[in-house]
Amino acid sequence: MAEIRNYTLNFGPQHPAAHGVLRLILEIDGEVIERADPHIGLLHRGTEKLVESKPYNQSIGYMDRLDYVSMMCNEHAYIMAIETMLGIKVPERAQYIRVMFDEITRILNHLMWLGTHGLDVGAMSIFLYAFREREKLIDCYEAVSGSRMHATYYRPGGVYRDLPDKMPQYLASGFRTDKELKTMNENRQGSLLDFIADFVKEFPKSIKQYDDLLTDNRIWKQRLVNIGIVSANRAKQLGFTGPMLRGSGVAWDLRKNQPYAVYDQLEFDIPVGVTGDSYDRYLVRMEEMRQSNHIIKQCVKWLQGNPGAVMSDDHKVSPPKRTDMKGDMESLIHHFKLFTEGYCLSEGEIYRAVEHPKGEFGIYLISDGANKPYRVKIRAPGFAHLAAMNEMARGHMLSDVVTIIGTQDIVFGEIDR
């Protein structure tokens, strides 16, 4: 009788659970994974080279398009690298706004992860629940930047503008009654800060709903417990960061270990796992949402009592006011030169990283003294996590590969760059 051999299966890049354009070549013995070989590059856009071809202040938008679920956190690392090279002092109010939106972004990312991860393993309802809250936070993005995704809100020296005094409201439509419209606009009568304050007050109830749906659900536990186990020591060797590292029991978080912005002035805890499996990583991310909610609450309280500037007064990076440009030729020239030629950084190199929702997102920037970088290297957390796919999937069933892709929380915008 002929010997039965392993067979090869192409998973993706059109698979709905591939989270973008992942192509996995799976070597399978029956239904057990013997080898998983990720093929990347299908979303490569040459971002690093594009950033090197434009003035520093024209490349902020490229950062949003890396991990397109965690937009403002990407911007923060790039902006901090430029500010460190320029030696600019950022106003405290701008720092608090940045931290608040970093944490809003973290919740946005984790809600997207929770909804899609649940959908991947068969929990349909959680997707709808997660997007209910996500919509409110996307509205906060829209209120400050005009964009629901690619905000380009952070600028070297501060932020684009202060928080608006009026929250945008839903308009009358033939699809909704006056009563429905009134209910939808109930918490939008005040400022953006009032809206966020209302959100952080109600959000713990939403997290409890997610908990009730999933945490003790026996099918959810059967699909996640003991799947994709990575020990603490092995996680460090593989270069894991963020929830992937903390899920293995390592309490490493840049917000605590290497504080930036105003994180050292805020109170929050770092959740860690025990066994390093997919279920532990789920619990870590759930607790991270609670901690982010607590941080946002502290930021809102501080911002409500401390008005002030949100942009540095350094004319090298700060554009003139729109009203000044209407009647002052020098202001018009200043604006034109700033947004066409940008500014030059002194020669040198810098690495700045932030605690991104997926891990350590870093920017390594080399300047040769020109108005555009000589070299930019983007350290994407998902790249190291995907590299461990073979190790995490080996010995598991084919259906568990979907769980492992979900627990890694990979987005190909940052991996392929």
Curated annotation (Swiss-Prot):
It is found in: Cell inner membrane. Belongs to the complex I 49 kDa subunit family. It catalyses: a quinone + NADH + 5 H(+)(in) = a quinol + NAD(+) + 4 H(+)(out). Its EC number is 7.1.1.-. It is a peripheral membrane protein. NDH-1 is composed of 14 different subunits. Subunits NuoB, C, D, E, F, and G constitute the peripheral sector of the complex. The lineage of its organism: Bacteria, Pseudomonadati, Pseudomonadota, Gammaproteobacteria, Candidatus Pseudothioglobaceae. Transmembrane segments: none annotated. This is NADH-quinone oxidoreductase subunit D. InterPro entries: NADH_Q_OxRdtase_suD, NADH_UbQ_OxRdtase_49kDa_CS, NDH1_su_D/H, NiFe-Hase_large. Keywords: Cell inner membrane, Cell membrane, Membrane, NAD, Quinone, Translocase, Transport, Ubiquinone. It holds the Pfam family Complex1_49kDa. NCBIfam families: NuoD (TIGR01962), PRK06075.1 (NF004739). PROSITE patterns: COMPLEX1_49K. NDH-1 shuttles electrons from NADH, via FMN and iron-sulfur (Fe-S) centers, to quinones in the respiratory chain. The immediate electron acceptor for the enzyme in this species is believed to be ubiquinone. Couples the redox reaction to proton translocation (for every two electrons transferred, four hydrogen ions are translocated across the cytoplasmic membrane), and thus conserves the redox energy in a proton gradient. One of its GO terms (cellular component) is plasma membrane. Its main location: membrane. GO terms for molecular function: NAD binding; NADH:ubiquinone reductase (non-electrogenic) activity; quinone binding. The gene is nuoD. Disulfide bonds: none annotated.
